[in-house]
Regions:
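Helix-turn-helix repeat elements of alpha-solenoid scaffolds
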Residues: 15-29, 56-75, 102-120
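Flexible helix-coil transition and linker loops at the boundaries of alpha-helical arrays
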Residues: 32-43, 73-87, 117-121
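A ubiquitous short alpha-helical element
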Residues: 12-17, 34-35
Length: 121
């Protein structure tokens, strides 16, 4: 069975690799391990790391799913996030708005809604 230490080691290893699809794949695996383990703090931490890996690895659209998961979790259970994680989530929010704004399939109204939500955050 995968342990908390296994997950933390995987995140550290992925972080040391730099950015790119291989890193994203390793972090995505850590997310699935954290889900199986069921520890909420690890579920949050791994998704923050996955969002970052996708954003830094030139896979910005893939970052939206783990970002939205964390945003919803923060709205329901803010106590799961420490101050540094809240700042990271805020940064991810800014990047998500920029990614949405750059997509011609996302309406201007939707982008404005996202911007308003970011301001409220």
């Amino acid at each position: 069975m995968t342990t908390r230490e296994d997950i933390l080691e995987r995140l550290a290893y992925a972080d040391a690799l730099g950015h790119g699809p291989r890193t994203s794949a390793l972090v995505a695996e850590a997310v699935s391990w954290a889900d199986a383990l069921g520890e909420e703090d690890l579920r949050v931490a791994t998704r923050l790391a996955l969002t970052e890996a996708y954003q830094q690895g030139n896979e910005e659209w893939k970052a939206l799913e783990p970002f939205v998961w964390n945003l919803a979790r923060y709205q329901r259970r803010p106590e799961l996030f420490d101050d540094a994680q809240v700042r990271t989530l805020h940064w991810h929010f800014k990047r998500a708005v920029a990614v949405a704004a750059a997509n011609p399939k996302v309406s201007k109204d939707k982008v404005r809604q996202l911007e308003a939500s970011l301001e409220e955050f």
